[in-house]
Amino acid sequence: MTKNVAVAPNTRPEMYKMMCDAVERSGAALTGVEDAEGLIWADPARPELFPEIAEKAASLQWIQLPYAGIEPFANNLDPKWRWTCGKGVYAPAVAETVLALALSLSKNLHGYARATEWSGPVGRYLHGSNVTILGGGGITVELLPLLAPFDCVTTVIRKKDENLPGATFTYTPEKLEEVLGTTDLLILALALTEETKGIIDKKSLSLMPPHSHIVNVARGGHIVTDDLIEALKEGKIAGAALDVTDPEPLPADNPLWSDQRCLITPHIGNTPEMGLKLLDPFIEENVRRFINDEELLAPVDVELGY
């Protein structure tokens, strides 16, 4: 016996169609919201539509959100429903972006891209660097093998007090300040929660070596933007690569745009071209698990918010 699964809202046609096709391939009955036992959310940019749509689904048991970051839905995380998200789905694409940004910083590609005349050589070796990664989720799991050929000393800071395979060291957040003092490259790949908001601030930046770099592919809110601007201006760190910013989009008059030590990309760690291809089989598999009463992939802890 199958189950009824709806896809909503129909505001992003390409994503909506992909999700509908995935539901049908899974063996579930694609239905309207009113009859749905499962709901596949089809527009991560429209969380304000959720309450009205969910209210129509009297038999709703499970909600699948498309992205790993679910903070726009934080006010809707009712424990009466089972929640899953896209954590881990986009990790391969985002991990590639991290490596590209890290290499760009180490070779000063962002500086040379802005140059209008020939200049002297600037850059350093990524090989053997002390790399600190905040977050022990899917992005980090995919990133560690990419860093392995560079023989980096990798330190993962994660909430779970458990070694992460592939990392040289794994610590809980209490060790962060101690670790920052020997960090050559700091990578942010963690969930945004009340605990992690502003985790990189003036104090954190002051602990880092002057030659250190930061790569942020998580959420802009992890870094206090004004503190980063000051740290770059005063030479407290050597550079930053930001695929996410706070605010986002970053206003055109923000000083980070003109700072030669800052590389900004417009949240392209996971583009629609990459994301839909990765999300398609994931949705199909999770719906199949739902209708067969199997363990669901990427469950959300409602209490933790991720």
Describe the role of every protein-language-model region.
Residues 51-59, 74-79, 205-211, 231-235, ...:
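Short, conserved loop/helix-junction motifs that constitute active-site signature segments
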Residues 211, 217-306:
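Rossmann-like dinucleotide-binding domain for NAD(H)/NADP(H)
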Residues 95-111, 149-150, 280-289, 294:
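Oxidoreductase and adenylate-handling cofactor-binding alpha/beta cores
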Residues 111-142, 169:
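Glycine-rich NAD(P)-binding loop of Rossmann-like domains
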Residues 149-166:
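NAD(P)-binding Rossmann-fold cofactor-contacting core
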Residues 161-255:
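Rossmann-like adenosine-cofactor binding region
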Residues 38-113:
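Phosphate/diphosphate ligand-binding glycine-rich loop within oxidoreductases
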Residues 1-45:
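N-terminal glycine-/charge-rich "phosphate-binding" loop or analogous flexible N-terminal tail
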